[in-house]
Amino acid sequence: MVREEEKGIPVRVVRCRPLVPKETSEGCQMCLSFVPGEPQVIVGSDKAFTYDYVFDPSVEQEEVFNTAVAPLIRGIFKGYNATVLAYGQTGSGKTYSMGGTYTASQEHDPSMGVIPRVIKLLFKEKEQRQDWEFVLKVSYLEIYNEDILDLLCSSRERSSQISIREDPKEGIKIVGLTERNVASARDTVSCLEQGNNCRTVASTAMNSQSSRSHAIFTICIDQKKKNDKNSSFHSKLHLVDLAGSERQKKTKAEGDRLKEGININRGLLCLGNVISALGEENKKGGFVPYRDSKLTRLLQDSLGGNSHTLMIACVSPADSNLEETLNTLRYADRARKIKNKPIVNVDPQAAELNHLKQQVQQLQVLLLQAHGGTLPVSINSMAPSENLQSLMEKNQSLMEENEKLSRGLSEAAGQTAQMLERIIVTEQENEKMNAKLEQLQQHAVCKLDLQKLLETVEDEELKENVEVIRNLQQVLAQFQSESAAAAEAATEMANAEQDAAGEAETGQVTKRSSDDFTTQHALRQAQMSKELVELNKALALKEALAKKMIQNDSQLEPIQSQYQTNIKDLELEVSNLQKEKEELILALSMAKKDVNQAKLSERRRKRLQELEGQINELKKKLNEQAKLLKLKESTERTVSKLNQEIREMKNQRVQLMRQMKEDAEKFRQWKQQKDKEVIQLKERDRKRQYELLKLERDFQKQASVLRRKTEEAAAANKRLKDALQKQREAADKRKESQNRGMEGVAARVKSWLANEVEVLVSTEEARRHLADLLEDRKILAQELLQLKEKKESGENPPSKLRRRTYSITDLQASEMDLSLSKQIESLETEMELRSAQIADLQQKLLDADNGDRVKQRWDNIATILEAKCALKYLLGELVSSKVQESKLESSLQQSKTNCSDIQKMLIEERNHATEMEAEFQNQLLLQEQQHQQEVLYLLSQFQQKEAPGKGVEDSLSEQEKQMQERLKFQEKELEKMREICEKNQELLQENDVLKQKMLLVQVASGQKLRRDQQVSPESPDSPFDYIPPKPKTRRQTVAKPRAPTPEMNVEELFSDSEESGEEEDAEWVPVKAAKGTKKSATGCFCKGRCGNRQCGCRKQKVGCTAGCSCDSTKCRNRDPGFQDATVCEDQTKDSEGSFKLEDLRDVTAGETFFQPVYSPPTMKVLKDITDQGVFMKKPSTAASLLVRDEESQENQLPFVKKKKRMLSSNTSFFSGCTPIKEEID
């Protein structure tokens, strides 16, 4: 383990799976071989790869785990990170090796993969370490289409929140990923099952359960020692199941599957680039493209980082996957060069504490060594020294001084704010002055000619006023000129800055914006100040009014008290007077009764009047006092209202002042920021000025150097002119030598490039042939499997084996009736031959695809001259190939156009032939119906002839009538037959023309000609059959023939009826027609020796004549005497125009087509008629005949020929007819 840690080389394992049933059924062979006892695998015959471990197909899962994976798991408890990585093409067994489809029900299954075995081993090791505390967390994610998906999250909504972060201490971290605490193996397996159920899986042509994403199952382990909390470790275990690399040609992926495959291959390509960058020894410390893919980003620690890594390269042994297997082995071989640097992962705080403790111990040891091995007692009880006290005092004084300075700074800030307010006020006054100045300028527009006015004005006072106005105008003009000069100076300064710094526009915009902001601030301040002044005035007025009213109230208080006293006295006096009045009224009323008291009552009356007057006066005074009191109350209300308004105005003034201060503070901050910017701009301007000076100095230096160089150039120009001639001569000589050398180099480079191109083209052709051979072997394997199944089930062998083939023996075997065993043996032999060819081609491709040759291909080009020659040659070859390709494309297009035209013509001819065939068949049916009616009529006449009960006296007369009728009828029929013969001759000629056209069309379309020979019914699918490909349709059948019927063309159908002859078969069974492609109207048309009964002349018991189509040198049926007699007899019959009717009773069974009357001779005829009716119920259309192969025609024509023979064999009988339906009924 120590050596492994020092080297830091990840372990590489190659595991080979056995052939799957699909590969076995396709006939695939093993392309890998393993060296017993050595970790070596051999591809083909001589290409060997060596790894740390190699497992052949017979090795079980347990051995793989114990040998390669278990050591990594034990290192996890020591604080090391570990990664187990499965890589390979799709369908090579990665998920099987990793256990990606494991469930709890497979606990004791020997095929259990790496992940469940790791879980078991982890918890087993955990139970053995009782002095440690463990915390285990698991997470499960997949990378699907470059998106990270959390497989332990119930909803996929959190997947968008997952991100990858890099911690300098902990390495790669995944933020937002679900981590679950697990305490037992059962909990961990349940998390694994949940993730496996959520993983993306789909079916492809290579694998029914193909993983469509990269899956990473991570187990985090935190362990702490129980008796030492500072001793802790943190480690991670990544179990990675990569999706397999795939080719769209083999997987047949489309749509989403194709997109998934593209993303999978992209991620694996990035992984390969990372492995290549890490494995190149000459580029140590170079850039590693971890960030090109999320897969490589997550595996950054596992590849070249802090981790022990195990890569399991899964390969397929089938020779059909040889190229992918070779790429996988090379991939794993590159990964062997990666060197990781694993370290023990400890808690950083605990590590820091341990480091500090070690440092303290070291310092204590040093102190002990300095004091002679003992620590002095004064170290623990030593008080703070005087130096420390002085420092503390100094620190205290500095803090006090800092506080003073802070207070002074705050006061200075306040004063600054006041100064800013004064500046604002001053600016406002300045703005007012400017406004007045503008007004004066407006008034000064209409300037008067003061000099003329002075001359015309005589009044002294007016002259003085005009003089004052003129002085004011002079002052105004001077002020304007000064302002203009100041503006010009500012403009010049701005222009100078623009020339120096190149930022005049920006400065002007900034200055303009600053001036606008300042003006707006000043206007706001002025407006608020004006509002404040008005508010203060109104407040002062209201305060004065309130004060005045309060003073009046204070003065009214003694008067009010006096008035109240007077009111009370007056009220008392009024009440007394009222009482007195009442008494006087009572006394007066009493006095009226007493006459003696008249004078007294008079006095009392007067007194009463006086009292009433006093009472009225007192009431008036009371009313006035009441009015004064009401006035005081209203005054108090007014005072309270004024006080309320004063308070509101004070609040408003406070708010306004606060707003002014805030605005002033904002302006101060803005001003401070602008001052900083101005300082920065000035600093930048100084730098630019310095750079400008530096550039000027450099320019002067360059100018001086340029002058010196110009002088030197002028001096050297003369020398150059003298040397030009020599240079031209040398250049001409060098050019001649280069041309001579270029010819040899061009020839060498051309031959080398031609050889390389030929090798590459041969390699590609070999690959193409290899693919064809693999496909051919697959088809052969399928056919072999079908034959074996049929042999087991006892079925008959197929009539033809449809397959691709490269040998002529296959064509011959397709037409032969082989037994199943022979066919199986031949297929096995062919498969062995194909396998040998495949192995040979694959070995040659392995030799041709040598990686060193590809790298050293361009080493032969070492100079620019050779490169130019190579480019010139390649460019010429490219142009010539493009021109040739263009010619071939135009030729192909023309051929396609011609082919389409010929196909159209062929379709038209077929349509015409179909129409003609339908028409001929209709005519044939009509003729046959007529013939059957005649036969029935003759039979009925024959039965009547034999029937008893007829009188002798009536027989002669009736017989004469019948003979006359027969003669008439025969003459009519002869006329009809002559017409039919003429039509047949015309149709035969037309048929010959159509055949010639059909032949021309087939030759023009490049199709093979159909052989006009009888095809065996056991092999109707001959490879020389009709060539134009058509979809196979359901064959239209007619009534079953009892014997194989030969094919018949149109000439045979409409040939002369006399060629068929008589048949000796009692049941009218038609015999086979002789083979031939062309038949004449008379005589036989045999191709052979005319030795059997298939010869038409031999059937009629006549010899062959010169009109026959048979070969006279081979014919055995040529008898001149017999032949001439037959011909003369035929001519005699034709010249008479009628036939001699024989007595039906004298006809023997051997010389007629009918049996005697007592036998039922019409059953065969009726059956044939019924079959013909069934045949006519299915008429063939032009469209169906276009897609029908020649097999249907071969099946129909013999039946038609049979009917034609039946028609031609009865031309000597003519009679009335009876409907067929009656006879059938």
From Swiss-Prot:
As cofactor, the record names: [2Fe-2S] cluster; [4Fe-4S] cluster
Q: Where is the Kinesin motor domain?
A: 9-338
Q: Where is the composition biased (Polar residues)?
A: 507-520
Q: Where is the composition biased (Basic and acidic residues)?
A: 719-738
Q: Which UniProt keywords apply?
A: ATP-binding, Chromosome, Coiled coil, Cytoplasm, Cytoskeleton, DNA-binding, Iron, Iron-sulfur, Metal-binding, Microtubule, Motor protein, Nucleotide-binding, Nucleus
Q: Where in the cell is it found?
A: Nucleus; Chromosome; Cytoplasm, Cytoskeleton
Q: Does the keyword DNA-binding apply?
A: yes
- Cross-referenced InterPro entries: Kinesin-like_fam, Kinesin_motor_CS, Kinesin_motor_dom, Kinesin_motor_dom_sf, P-loop_NTPase, Tesmin/TSO1-like_CXC
Listed under GO biological process in this entry are: microtubule-based movement; mitotic spindle organization; spindle elongation
Please provide, alphabetically and separated by semicolons, the GO molecular function terms listed in this UniProt record.
ATP binding; DNA binding; iron-sulfur cluster binding; metal ion binding; microtubule binding; microtubule motor activity
What biological function has been recorded for the protein in this entry? Iron-sulfur (Fe-S) cluster binding motor protein that has a role in chromosome segregation during mitosis. Required for mitotic chromosomal positioning and bipolar spindle stabilization.
Q: How is the cofactor bound?
A: Binds 1 [4Fe-4S] cluster. In the presence of oxygen, the [4Fe-4S] cluster may be converted to [2Fe-2S].
- Which Gene3D superfamilies is this protein grouped with? Kinesin motor domain
Give the matching Pfam families: Kinesin
Q: Which SUPFAM superfamilies match?
A: P-loop containing nucleoside triphosphate hydrolases (SSF52540)
User: Could you name the Gene Ontology cellular component terms for this entry?
Assistant: chromosome; cytoplasm; microtubule; microtubule associated complex; nucleus
Name the family the entry cites. Answer: Belongs to the TRAFAC class myosin-kinesin ATPase superfamily. Kinesin family. Chromokinesin subfamily.
Where do the annotations place ATP binding?
88-95
Matches recorded under PANTHER family? CHROMOSOME-ASSOCIATED KINESIN KIF4A-RELATED
Quote the tissue specificity entry. Expressed in proliferating cells; neuroepithelium of embryos.
Species name for this entry? Answer: Gallus gallus
- What is the protein name for this chain? Chromosome-associated kinesin KIF4
